[in-house]
C-alpha cells in the first residue's frame, strides 16, 4: 500500500507540473491597442516591434493578460495614467496591470494580493521588464478587512486604483477604496460578468463617494470606471 500511495502521489505531482507547463503552449504574444503583451519565453513578432512591450510569466499567480477583463482594464489605464500617477493594484496576481501602468509612465504602484505567490511573480516580471523593484511594492493580505494592510497601503494617496477580480468582491471594495484614493482619483474595475453589471452599477450609484464615469464591454465582460467626488 505504501508503494501504491507513493506512486499515486508522484503521479499527481507530475500531473500538477504538466498542468503548470502545458498551459504555456496556449499563451502567445497578443496586442491591446499599441501594447504588445508576450510571455517571457516567446520572441517579439517582427510586425509588432514598434509596440510598447510587456513581458509576463505568471508562474502560479493569476494573470497572463489574455482574458477580456484584463484587456478592459489595460485600455482604461491607457486613458488615465500620467507621469505623476500613484497606482493601487488590488488583486495584483502576476502584476500585469501594475506593470502596464508603470510602462505607460506611472510613478509608482502598490499591489495587494491574497496569494503569497504574487509577491514572487511580480518580482520576476519586474525584472523581465527592466523595472526597478522599488517602483512596485506588493503585500499579501486583504485590503477589505485587514487594518494592517489598509494602513500600509496609505490613505488619500492614489490617483488610480485598479481591481480585476469578481463582481461580488468589487461590490465590497467600492466601500473601502475611496479612503485610499485622492479626490478626483479613479477606480477602474473589471472581472464583472455581464449578468452582474447592474448589481455593480447599483453599488457604485449608492455610494456617495463615487460617480460612474465610464462602462465598457468586451465579449460578456464589463469594466466600470468610477471617479471619487
Question: What is the role of each PLM region?
Answer:
Residues 1-5:
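Short, small-residue-biased leader/transition segments that mark boundaries at the very start
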Residues 6-47:
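N-terminal auxiliary segments of SAM/dcSAM-dependent transferases
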Residues 114-228:
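S-adenosylmethionine
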Residues 50-58:
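A short, charged helix-loop
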Residues 60, 64-143:
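Conserved SAM/SAH cofactor-binding pocket of Class I
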